[in-house]
């Protein structure tokens, strides 16, 4: 039986971030090209940069996963395969997918390429995961709202690899189901153009106690951030995730700087290695 060693998966929005992730110890890097990605405002990779990145990663025995994780319109599908083909031929290790039509098209046209179900698919239970497995998916990025026990059960019941977010920003809504940006800014978060209205301050208006509609004065409270979640950090729970044999530990941040990518990746690399190769690391994990 192969010895367990969870994959550390780091983000890259630029070539400098890719190099930083590799240097800091990432086993794999996920990144987006100029099309079909859920981070339209990241640097993203041109065709030439992506091919260069694949060559660099494979030189260091690291993997590259390409994000094709947005909802796709009918007139965009025709150019999908031509866009993916050079990366597939260069040994692209996997594609992270949201759209079901994209999934089917990739499965038929690129045999042997790993297909990963994006967190944007909102996979929360085993029947959904098994359906995706029947369509060729080999790895699930489960909804970030799931508990560790739910993820563990999902893995046991499906036999699929689990890629779990361990660090970074969280959406206030279920992954892949948010329409807030579309409502307020006319920019679809499910098409890679989220305006992040949940990160903005809001003025909370109310009534003084006992005032009701008739008697009380309108009360204006200082601006607050009621919808902006704190960032995720699982370092204190890393031993439990590794005990659950999570397959891939994913850091959020394709719009972050190379310094951020390098720093966070190095920290998780250190503690993952300590847990794998020593017995006293768990006591030293505090964020």
Q: Over which residues does each language-model region extend?
A:
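N-terminal basic/disordered segments at the start of proteins
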Residues: 4-28
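Hydrophobic faces of well-ordered beta-strands that scaffold small-molecule active sites
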Residues: 8-11, 29-31, 64-68, 95-97, ...
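Conserved, mostly hydrophobic/aromatic
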Residues: 21, 99, 132, 164, ...
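Glycine-rich, proline-tolerant flexible connector loops at the mouths of alpha/beta enzymes
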Residues: 30-48, 68-74, 254-261
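Active-site-adjacent beta->alpha loops and helix N-cap segments on the catalytic face
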Residues: 41-51, 100-106, 145-157, 258-260
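Active-site beta->alpha loop and helix N-cap motifs at the rims of alpha/beta catalytic domains
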Residues: 47-109, 114-122
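Catalytic alpha/beta core domains of metabolic enzymes, predominantly
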Residues: 114-247, 261-264
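Conserved small/polar residues in nucleotide/adenosyl-binding loops
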Residues: 277-282
């Amino acid at each position: 039986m192969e010895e367990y060693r969870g994959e550390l998966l780091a983000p890259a929005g630029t070539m400098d971030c890719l190099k930083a992730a590799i240097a800091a110890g990432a086993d794999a890097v996920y990144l987006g090209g100029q099309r079909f990605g859920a981070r339209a405002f990241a640097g993203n990779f041109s065709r030439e940069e992506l091919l260069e990145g694949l060559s660099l990663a494979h030189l260091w025995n690291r993997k590259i996963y390409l994000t094709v994780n947005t909802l796709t319109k009918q007139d965009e599908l025709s150019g999908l395969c031509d866009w993916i083909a050079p990366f597939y031929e260069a040994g692209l290790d996997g594609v992270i997918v949201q759209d079901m039509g994209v999934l089917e098209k990739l499965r038929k046209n690129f045999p042997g390429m790993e297909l990963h179900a994006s967190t944007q698919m909102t996979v929360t239970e085993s029947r959904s995961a098994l359906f995706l497995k029947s369509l060729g998916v080999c790895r699930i990025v489960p909804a970030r709202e799931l508990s560790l026990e739910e993820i563990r059960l999902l893995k046991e019941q499906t036999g699929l690899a689990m890629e779990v977010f361990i660090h970074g920003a969280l959406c206030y809504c279920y992954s892949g189901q948010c329409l807030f940006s579309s409502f307020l800014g006319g920019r679809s978060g499910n098409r890679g153009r989220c305006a992040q209205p949940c990160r903005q301050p809001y003025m909370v208006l109310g009534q003084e106690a006992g005032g009701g509609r008739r008697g009380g004065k309108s009360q204006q409270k200082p601006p607050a951030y009621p919808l902006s979640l704190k960032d995720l950090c699982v370092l204190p729970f890393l031993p439990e995730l590794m005990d659950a044999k999570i397959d891939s530990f994913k850091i959020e941040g394709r719009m972050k700087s190379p310094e951020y990518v390098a720093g966070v990746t190095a920290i998780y690399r250190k503690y993952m290695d300590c847990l794998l190769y020593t017995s006293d690391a768990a006591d030293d994990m505090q964020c």
